[in-house]
Regions:
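C-terminal long alpha-helix characteristic of the crotonase
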Residues: 155-161, 203, 212-260, 264, ...
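CoA-thioester-processing core
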Residues: 121, 125, 135, 141-195, ...
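Conserved CoA-thioester-binding segment of acyl-CoA-metabolizing enzymes
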Residues: 2-87, 105, 123
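Acidic, divalent-metal-coordinating active-site segment for phosphoryl/phosphodiester hydrolysis
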Residues: 142, 198-205
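Glycine- (often His-adjacent) and acidic-residue-rich active-site loop
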Residues: 26, 80, 88-123, 140, ...
Length: 280
């Protein structure tokens, strides 16, 4: 019954077109640090957030974070978005982490507020209503890895991607969810080791540990992880979105509630015997 409902039931979804910004062959055209793109044709339903701050290797500065939050708010309202990919427009880097030069100019109070905003950003990514994929073709350090950890799936270039929570080597500690998400991904003991040492991992090493889903050989263009993320997104597209899936589950469960078999199953569990189902 669930299979039939999943394949036939459709839920109306209001269409609100995305405001696309510069996700073309010239990603710097829009002059923004964060650009939003909705793909078309067979890729319709895939949206991309392009991080493009070459002067600071996509470091998480005030403007960068504000534009990321703005992009997520825009995408969250578009129910046609079925998969969201985070990628970089800066060759050799995904996100270099916190903008320490900018942070050095902040007061202690300002630092506290900004780190709180970073945590909020990662929470927004983790709570995004569609599957999210981080395409790491280059360095993902500190907050950059925390951003990737907030995504559902991670794809990395085998050799050119370098990742790690390196804050302890800077006299800091992970402050945007890394201490929580890394242990949930790898287990407590291994996460502690990586955080305490600030160790950097290649894409191959990260895949071996289970930190990334796929590690792919880099190509001449330097965007192999992005291409694998696109292919993965295309596989996800036919699947029902989470909200509709939960609605389907609710419909199926409601049909089960009044049945005699449901009551028989609970009675059998209570009486420690095998159930005698009658199909009613």
């Amino acid at each position: 019954m669930l299979r039939v409902l999943t394949s036939t039931l459709r839920f109306p979804r209001p269409w609100k077109p995305l405001e696309t910004r510069g996700c073309s062959s010239n990603p710097g055209a829009a002059g923004r640090e964060i650009q939003v793109c909705a793909l078309a044709g067979p890729n319709q339903g895939i949206a991309e957030i392009l991080m493009n701050r070459p002067s600071a290797r996509n470091a998480l500065g005030n403007v960068f974070v504000s534009q990321l939050l703005e992009a997520l708010a825009q995408l969250r309202e578009d129910r046609q978005v079925r998969v969201l990919i985070f990628r970089s427009g800066v060759k050799g880097v995904f996100c270099a982490g916190a903008d320490l030069k900018e942070r050095e100019q902040m007061s202690e109070a300002e630092v506290g507020l900004f780190v709180q905003r970073l945590r909020g950003l990662m929470t927004e990514i983790a709570a995004f209503p569609a599957p999210t994929i981080a395409a790491m073709d280059g360095f993902a350090l500190g907050g950059g890895l925390e951003l990737a950890l907030a995504c559902d799936l991670r794809v990395a270039a085998a050799s050119s991607a370098v990742m790690g929570l390196i804050e302890t080597t800077r006299g800091l500690l992970p402050g945007a969810g890394g201490t929580q998400r890394l242990p949930r991904c790898l287990g407590v003991a291994l996460a502690k080791e990586l955080i305490f040492t600030g160790r950097r991992l290649s894409g191959v090493q990260a895949q071996a540990l289970g930190l990334v889903n796929h590690a792919v050989a880099q190509n001449e263009e330097g965007n192999a992880a992005y291409h694998r993320a696109r292919a993965l997104a295309q596989e996800i597209l036919p699947q029902v979105d989470i909200a509709s899936g939960m609605a389907i589950e609710g419909i199926c469960y409601a049909q089960n509630i009044p049945t005699r078999d449901r009551l028989e199953g609970m009675a059998a569990f209570r009486e420690k015997r095998l159930p005698r189902f009658v199909g009613e």
